[in-house]
C-alpha cells in the first residue's frame, strides 16, 4: 500500500514468525532491550502467544507495553475484531454524514486508525515521563471503539451532555448541510466567520452592511440560534466573483478564508511550495518518489534526512545480529521460516 511509504520512513523492519521457537526467542531478546512494545491484535491472542503484560514484564520490568485493539476489555465486545471502517460506523462517525445528507458514509481516510495511533503516542510519552520519575514500566490499553466514541461525541453529545438531557444530539452548526465549501464564480471558497468582527467584516465584504443590524445575525448567540439562516445568507453571496477576488476582499476585511483545494491542487499550494513541504527523493528500489516534509518544528534541533520505508524484513539480518544471533543461526532461521531476509529477491 502506497501510504506506507509515507508512514514507515525512518523505520527498520524485522519479520518474525512467533509460532516458531527461534522467532519467539528473537522477539524476547528484542523486548529485553526495548523501551516500548506496541502491538495491535486482540489481547487474547497476545495471551495465547505468552506475550501478556505479565509475561513481558518478566523479561523487561521497565518496558512500556502498549496495546491497540478494537474494544475495551470490560465490555461484551472485548473479543471482537475491529478495523477502521467498522469503528467509524459503530462510533457514530458515519452517522454525522447521515445527519447532513441523509445517507451514512465513512470518512474516506483511515481516520479511526490515525486518531487511535496519535492517542497511543500521547499515552506512551506520558508513560515514558512517568518511568523517568518513578523507574517503573507500565501497561497501556488503547481501545479503538471507546476512543472514537469520545472523539465523535466531544462535539456531538451536545445537549444530551446534561442529565436529564436539555435537547438532542449533534452540533447544529457542524451538521447543517450548508456547512461546506461555498460555490464561487469559478470554484469554491472556505470561510469561517465566527466572531462578531469576522461576521461583520464578511457582511461588509459581500456588500450587505445592513445584515450587521439584523436581529438574527447581530451577535454570536443570535447567529448560533439562527444558524441555517446565517449559512443561507452567507452561501448565497459568493457566486458573483471568482475565488481569487473573494480571497483578496475577505483578507482586506480580516475574515478567515482559504481556497478550496482538490487532492491535486493542494500539492501546488504556494505556501507549501514556499515551505518546501513536498520533496522528491530517490527510493532504493522504487525510483523517484514524492514525500512530505515533517511539518512540525522545534528549537532543539533541525530536521534530519529520512530513510525510505523498508520492505518487510528488510533489516531482519542486521537487527538479529544486534540481538546476539550469529550468522549461522540467522541463516538457519531464514531457511526454517522463523524470519525472512527482505533484502533477498523472491
Residue ranges of model-derived segments:
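Short, small-residue-biased leader/transition segments that mark boundaries at the very start
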Residues: 1-2
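An anion/phosphate-binding loop that grips the pyrophosphate of nucleotide cofactors and donors
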Residues: 34
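Aromatic-enriched alpha-helical interface/lid elements that frame and gate functional surfaces
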Residues: 173, 177-253, 257
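Flexible, small-/acidic-enriched active-site or ligand-binding loops
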Residues: 218, 285-332
Amino acid at each position: 500500500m502506497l501510504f506506507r511509504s509515507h508512514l514507515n520512513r525512518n523505520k527498520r523492519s524485522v519479520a518474525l514468525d512467533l509460532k516458531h521457537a527461534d522467532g519467539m526467542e528473537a522477539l524476547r531478546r528484542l523486548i529485553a532491550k526495548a523501551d516500548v512494545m506496541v502491538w495491535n491484535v486482540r489481547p487474547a491472542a497476545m495471551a495465547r502467544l505468552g506475550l501478556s503484560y505479565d509475561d513481558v514484564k518478566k523479561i523487561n520490568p521497565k518496558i512500556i507495553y502498549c496495546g491497540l485493539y478494537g474494544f475495551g476489555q470490560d465490555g461484551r465486545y472485548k473479543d471482537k475484531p475491529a478495523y477502521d471502517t467498522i469503528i467509524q460506523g459503530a462510533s457514530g462517525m458515519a452517522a454525522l454524514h447521515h445527519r447532513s445528507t441523509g445517507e451514512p458514509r465513512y470518512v474516506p481516510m483511515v481516520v479511526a486508525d490515525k486518531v487511535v495511533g496519535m492517542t497511543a503516542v500521547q499515552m506512551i510519552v506520558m508513560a515514558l515521563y512517568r518511568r523517568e520519575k518513578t523507574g517503573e514500566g507500565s501497561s497501556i490499553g488503547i481501545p479503538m471503539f471507546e476512543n472514537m466514541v469520545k472523539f465523535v461525541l466531544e462535539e456531538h453529545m451536545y445537549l444530551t451532555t446534561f442529565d436529564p438531557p436539555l435537547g438532542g444530539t449533534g452540533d447544529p452548526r457542524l451538521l447543517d448541510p450548508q456547512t461546506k465549501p461555498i460555490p464561487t464564480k469559478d470554484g469554491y471558497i472556505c470561510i469561517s466567520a465566527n466572531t462578531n468582527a469576522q461576521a461583520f467584516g464578511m457582511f461588509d465584504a459581500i456588500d450587505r452592511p445592513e445584515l450587521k443590524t439584523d436581529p438574527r445575525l447581530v451577535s454570536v448567540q443570535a447567529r448560533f440560534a439562527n444558524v441555517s439562516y446565517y449559512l443561507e445568507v452567507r452561501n448565497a453571496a459568493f457566486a458573483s466573483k471568482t475565488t481569487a477576488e473573494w480571497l483578496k476582499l475577505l483578507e482586506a476585511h480580516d475574515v478567515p478564508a482559504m481556497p478550496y483545494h482538490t487532492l491535486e491542487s493542494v500539492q501546488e499550494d504556494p505556501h507549501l511550495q514556499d515551505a518546501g513541504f513536498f520533496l522528491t527523493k530517490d527510493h532504493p528500489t522504487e525510483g523517484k518518489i514524492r514525500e512530505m516534509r515533517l511539518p512540525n518544528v522545534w528549537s532543539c534541533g533541525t530536521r534530519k534526512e529520512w530513510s525510505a520505508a523498508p520492505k518487510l524484513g528488510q533489516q531482519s539480518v542486521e537487527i538479529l545480529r544486534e540481538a546476539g544471533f550469529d550468522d549461522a543461526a540467522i541463516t538457519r532461521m531464514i531457511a526454517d521460516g522463523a524470519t525472512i531476509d527482505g533484502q533477498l529477491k523472491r
